[in-house]
Amino acid sequence: MSKVNVNKVVVAYSGGLDTSVIIPWLKENYDCEVVAFVADVGQGAEELEGIEAKAKASGASECYIADLKEEMVADYIFPTLKTGAYYEGKYLLGTSMARPIIAKAQVEVARKVGADALCHGCTGKGNDQVRFEGAFAALAPDLHVIAPWREWDLVSREECLDYLAERNIPCSASLTKIYSRDANAWHISTEGGVLEDTWNAPNEDCWAWTVDPEQAPNEAETVTLKVAKGEIVEVDGEAMTPYNALVYLNEKGAKHGVGRIDIVENRLVGMKSRGCYETPGGTIMMEALRAVEQLVLDKASFEFREELGLKASHLVYDGRWFTPLCKSILAASEELAQDVNGEVVVKLYKGQATVTQKRSDNSLYSEEFATFGEDEVYDQSHAEGFIRLYSLSSRIRALNSQKK
């Protein structure tokens, strides 16, 4: 494929080996100015330390750092939580939810500096290339997109390190990298290494955040969450922003080994991959929201929310955040969440987050009607007519069979 003419490109920069190579490679192969863009999505202070200097040492003319933590949790994670989305029944979409806001902010920087191209460091095997480029297509269809991993002939970490050494570009990366990790305020994912063989149990170093449940405290701890319109607004009696609530619950959950999963998932590009994911605070939040939903959503609404969650999980995973369908699902979930108000107590113990108490002013649960003892509010004889109508089609089908 022939290269397009590019004057200025904004690259999503992490400070790692791949993107450190990408900056000089872009300058050499596209003869263009390179602007680095760094998204702070809660990956940690260590990852961001000195990152502007690293980018410029690699050849970037400028480096923009955007603090996206609050916006990511409030405008991307919380709306997704309201849908009840779990990808393939387990994954709380930690990497997937971070990509659209990173891409959006990258486009904003490109507009600000007058760039005519965008660049990402995703490989040609993974989901992220689709997520980034899908977002770019929706937000900036006029900008060129460069994906070096689909163009260059570098195939190993050793070759990447040699590339930088030949150009006297400093890099702290080592030749040996056991795992591939992605981190943000919501989760940490770990892939590769021993995990590539599904018969290998995860080593303890596969987990970067949470305490081994077997080594977690022997005494349970409880947290109390207040929910308003499907969002966590207060934890343990203190009003908190979405991000601060997540940080607080992450600390509590990680201490007790909450939020670990080991999953083999179907990637968008067709292959399967295995990963160990840690989502301590998110797991607690999801348990609390589901508990309130059990109280306030009627049967039809709950079933519909389940359907929304399934569809939303695939849309978010597949990089279709900026689509009319995703927007519609989020809007429907927002409407269903209007009555999702209440208070929940969650017990944290040895890797488990268990709801032990829940209440809501909007609750459809009535102790008077639900009692298994004697009551005066429900005439059980009324059930007979309902059952005859409810089973009418089965009765007619059986009668037809008897006539044959």
From Swiss-Prot:
GO biological process, one term: urea cycle
Catalytic activity: L-citrulline + L-aspartate + ATP = 2-(N(omega)-L-arginino)succinate + AMP + diphosphate + H(+)
Main location: cytoplasm
EC number: 6.3.4.5
PROSITE patterns: ARGININOSUCCIN_SYN_1, ARGININOSUCCIN_SYN_2
Ranges that cross the membrane: none
Residues annotated to bind L-citrulline: 91, 96, 127, 131, 180, 189, 265, 277
Annotated residues for binding of ATP: 12-20, 39, 121
GO cellular component entries: cytoplasm
Keywords recorded for this protein, A-Z: Amino-acid biosynthesis, Arginine biosynthesis, ATP-binding, Cytoplasm, Ligase, Nucleotide-binding
Binding-site residues for L-aspartate, renumbered to this chain: 123, 127-128
Disulfide bonds: none
Location of this chain's protein in the cell: Cytoplasm
Pfam assignment, any one: Arginosuc_syn_C
Superkingdom of origin organism: Bacteria
Any GO molecular function: argininosuccinate synthase activity
InterPro entries, alphabetized: Arginosuc_syn_C, Arginosuc_syn_N, Arginosuc_synth, Arginosuc_synth_CS, Arginosuc_synth_type_1_subfam, AS_cat/multimer_dom_body, Rossmann-like_a/b/a_fold
Pathway stated in the Swiss-Prot or TrEMBL entry: Amino-acid biosynthesis; L-arginine biosynthesis; L-arginine from L-ornithine and carbamoyl phosphate: step 2/3
Top EC class, one word: ligase
Assembly with partners or alone: Homotetramer.
Family designation: Belongs to the argininosuccinate synthase family. Type 1 subfamily.
Protein name as it appears in the record: Argininosuccinate synthase
Species of the source: Vibrio campbellii (strain ATCC BAA-1116)
